[in-house]
Amino acid sequence: MHRGYDGLREHDFNEAHFEALKAARTGWPMVDACVTMLRETGWLNFRMRAMLVSVAAYPLWLHWRPVGEWLATQFLDYEPGIHWSQLQMQSGTTGINTTRVYNPIKQAQDHDPHGRFVRQWLPTMRQVPDTWLFEPWLMPDTMQAHLGVFTGCNSYTPSALVQPVVDLAQATREAKQLLHSRRQTDEVKAAKKAVVDKHASRKNWGTRSATSRRSPASKKADKQQLGFDF
């Protein structure tokens, strides 16, 4: 969509990060639970789809195309016209959309506060207390030994809790800096108008309120889409 972002992530693609994402072994429980559910059911709500792409694009620093090709094989409702524009938007490479970076720990705390969803799809997490459910790597060694679960395991045994593949805060911060630096280049700035002219709505660009023009029925549907009652 925006050629100014070509080369931003492609040459730094980390295959180990990609494999960890596809295997539901990133170490972030909400991400791994979502991938597990997606593989089993072929469906996720919109917020969690956006979170997966955001995690792939920022802390894991994966290019949107391989991630999108993989997700396309997982979604039962895959629709190319929606899918690929969303991949680029959530990756911050359209040049015309606000950058949205989803913190998988905060998403879990906000949308699965009691851990029902995570525990449903990650059996290993069922015995982890709420205090450490979304950050199990912080659990004291004595507690791990008591529960019979251990972080940092590389094996796929039932007792293995995976360490995060990267430091979330540091990796996200570095990704934002790289994206911001690219946005300041003359090439990206010059191409923005062409992207707006081709892809953005012609009516009142930049002035419309998304919430003000939407019907109550649409807002109700959004609320249902963001829920975890499956």
What does each model-identified segment do?
Residues M1-F230:
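C-terminal catalytic domain of photolyase/cryptochrome flavoproteins
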